[in-house]
From Swiss-Prot:
The protein's name: ATP-dependent Clp protease ATP-binding subunit ClpX
UniProt gene name: clpX
SMART domains (alphabetical): AAA (SM00382), ClpB_D2-small (SM01086), zf-C4_ClpX (SM00994)
Organism: Streptomyces avermitilis (strain ATCC 31267 / DSM 46492 / JCM 5070 / NBRC 14893 / NCIMB 12804 / NRRL 8165 / MA-4680)
Highest taxon of source: Bacteria
Keywords: ATP-binding, Chaperone, Metal-binding, Nucleotide-binding, Zinc
Protein's UniProt keywords contain Metal-binding: yes
A Pfam family reported for this protein in Swiss-Prot or TrEMBL: AAA_2
Chain positions recorded as ATP binding sites: P123, T124, G125, S126, G127, K128, T129, L130
Biological process terms in GO annotation: cell division; proteolysis involved in protein catabolic process
């Protein structure tokens, strides 16, 4: 058996060009050589590709209770919505699993399971988008967010509905097979309600027209998607994607829908036997809890569209206590994020309870919900985030209620003469 280098020639790796003296091992093939470093690199590339193309492992599909508990770690409150989403998502991917495995039934006996697309009602900043994002993160499936207000019917200025699918394909790194089991969240769907309950004789290209265009992809169809987005034209290739197993979560604030619900419920509650509720009871109750498909049709959604969203659930306005929990309790809570940012500069950041209450009150006053908390935190911490990184004498920053209410400077606690902060112990 011939040994490498017997002829006296200095052999090199055919891939990186390094000589046998520069590497640990040089493996010979028919007319080629590869070094141990190139082998390691090839293994890393293969592992990355396998990780990227890994699909949901259906045999390990989490149960509804496990999905709910995962959501609990990121989303505060909204128990009813989390429970409904957990069940709907589990049933959807169980349906996908049954479709891939044949469900253990012959083709003649097979029962076709319908899709469980979800309609999520609730005010802005109440956690609709976060719920959808968290579900996708747990299941390790591609996730895309689309804004319904940018969509128009095909042939008019604006985005075609197929561009929603392109975002999902891009999220899956153009792995169409993987994208076909992803989740799409369409926000602001209430903004495409038709102008009146009755069908219009004029073209409503950004309202009813969008709902009509969404029907097919919601139900399940093979759509042709332009790979670069934009409008379709005959001289381009298309990506074919089957939306049968794509889960659609459709959300919107539906401002004014509560009045339609009240008027319907009020018509049934007239007379001596009617249940009378105080204003306080009505405010504390989830305003969309009693929603019916007929209310959504009166709001301006077409019946065919509502029919393709069998799971209807809602999130409610966040009160002060819920906002306080959002600030400190979730795994990626805002207070924890800012404390980590200051920690990277070697500084502790503390919030007094009254300061957190003041931040929550500001969010309620601005009617921005949880989404507005970060903006308020940025305003409160802007001056100290500008000042502290340049100062080596600051050990701790304390945020009080006056900092939030009156825009006074935060309390800066200096280090001692040896450079220790007040909470640091002397080491032997």
């Amino acid at each position: 058996m011939a040994r490498i280098g017997d002829g006296g020639d200095l052999l090199k790796c055919s891939f990186c060009g390094k000589s046998q003296k520069q590497v640990k091992k040089l493996i010979a093939g028919p007319g080629v050589y590869i070094c141990d470093e190139c082998i390691d690199l090839c293994n890393e590339i293969i592992e990355e590709e396998l990780a990227e193309t890994s699909e949901v492992r259906w045999e390990e599909l989490p149960k509804p209770r496990e999905i709910y508990e995962f959501l609990e770690g990121y989303v505060v409150g909204q128990e009813a919505a989390k429970k409904a989403l957990s069940v709907a998502v589990y049933n959807h991917y169980k349906r996908v699993q049954a479709g891939e495995n044949g469900g253990g039934q012959s083709r003649e006996d097979a029962i076709e399971l319908a899709k469980s697309n979800i309609l999520l009602l609730g005010p802005t900043g109440s956690g609709k988008t976060l719920l959808a994002q968290t579900l996708a993160r747990m299941l390790n499936v591609p996730f895309a967010i689309a804004d319904a207000t940018a969509l128009t019917e095909a042939g008019y200025v604006g985005e075609d509905v197929e561009n929603i699918l392109l975002k999902l394909i891009q999220a899956a790194d153009y792995d169409v097979k993987k994208a076909e089991t992803g989740i799409i969240y369409i926000d602001e769907i209430d903004k495409v309600a038709r102008k009146s309950e009755n069908p219009s004789i004029t073209r409503d290209v950004s309202g009813e027209g969008v709902q009509q265009a969404l029907l097919k992809i919601l139900e399940g169809t093979t759509a042709s998607v332009p790979p670069q987005g934009g409008r379709k034209h005959p001289h381009q290739e298309f990506i074919q994607i089957d939306t049968t197993n794509v889960l659609f979560i459709v959300g919107g604030a539906f401002a004014g829908l509560e009045k339609l619900i009240e008027s319907r419920a009020g018509a049934k509650g007239i007379g001596f036997g009617a249940t009378i509720r105080s204003k306080r009871e009505l405010e504390s109750k989830d305003q969309f809890e009693d929603v019916m498909p007929e209310d959504l049709v009166k709001f301006g959604m077409i019946p065919e569209f509502i029919g393709r969203l069998p799971v209807i659930t809602s999130v409610h306005n966040l009160d002060r206590e819920a906002l306080l929990q959002i600030l400190v309790e979730p795994r990626n809570a805002l207070v924890k994020q800012y404390q980590r940012l200051f920690e990277l500069d070697g500084v502790e950041l503390d919030f007094e309870r009254e300061a957190l209450e003041a931040i929550a009150d500001q969010a309620i006053l601005r009617q921005t919900g949880a989404r507005g908390l970060r903006a308020i935190m940025e305003e409160v911490l802007m001056s100290v985030m500008y000042e502290v990184p340049s100062r080596k004498d600051v050990a701790r920053v304390v945020i009080t209620a006056d900092v939030v209410h009156s825009n006074v400077n935060p309390t800066l606690i200096p280090r001692d003469a040896r450079g220790r902060g007040p909470g640091e112990q002397k080491t032997a």
